[in-house]
Amino acid sequence: MASTHPSPCTESYDPRFDQLVLFNAELELLAEGFRWLEGPVWFGDHQCLLFNDIPNNRTLRWHKQDGVSVFREPSGFANGQTRDRQGRLITCHHSQRELTRIEHNGDVTTLVNNVNGKKLNAPNDVVVKSDGSIWFSDPVYGLLNDYEGGRQTSEQHPALYRLDPSTGEVAAVARDFEGPNGLAFSPDETKLYVAESGGAGESNPNQFIREFEVSADGKSLVSTKIFHKISPGWADGFRVDEQGNIWCGAADGVHCIAPDGTLI
């Protein structure tokens, strides 16, 4: 059963943030007792939330009427996921090292599991562009221990990929990463933001959100810069709202970052 709590821990650093939230809103605890949660996806048409408990190797479903139930077990140590333009669920899997799509009839389609004959690492997070193309990050985190999906050997460098689901063509759009993580497009899709989580440890300098300029044809990336450095901790998953603000998971909660890179 869900419970509500007052939310006195919201901190505003900029008047722009005050226009985004209701400070008398309450924080609602939907469920607890999990090990490590990732990949929340809201299905408004079904009024339910899907999310992954990675170490327990299962995807869970929350609904207001009946609470939490198991949606998929085993999940292939599923991590990030999203919906495509047809409302289907796209999921990153660590143990199978692949991206899948659940069709409307319940069938599961493997979208990609290798590039040029070499296995993917452990796909981490995914976003779908308005043209239907699927962009995903592929770090090695899910190969490093049994907790995240089982120790396996990496066959290629961490990278960011674009998949055309209509043709099956997959191409690396950026390889200069240590550990690509969450990603999302700006509202007009001229920019792609990607979390560079680097290696583990607060002292690692390669932990920040990068901003990429998307090419005119929307199929590649043409330039990059450091957009924002999260502190404390490092950037994990995030989404961009209709005003271009980034809502990003961090070590101490959720950070809201304005389009100019300011923590607000």
Model-assigned labels for residue ranges:
Residues M1-I264:
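Sequence-structural signature of mature extracellular/luminal beta-sheet repeat domains
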